[in-house]
């Protein structure tokens, strides 16, 4: 889990501030594709939203050869979702 700059999320008729980003590898074929599931939580770790991301191509090559693939994946996922890690 990573802290993010607050993002407004509409949930069940109210606006909440997501401040936590979690990214989980759901599948990696270890060749050219990785699927992630992401979650956004508020400060109380209440899940506000979830979704999926697919990492392929040059991004996958960089991810799979990175000495810190977890950090790369979080930064890549945050960029895809227009989130800012703190």
Predicted features by range, described:
Residues 12, 17, 22, 39-42, ...:
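Compositionally biased, intrinsically disordered low-complexity regions enriched in proline and serine
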Residues 2-4, 9, 48-86:
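Acidic, low-complexity intrinsically disordered segments
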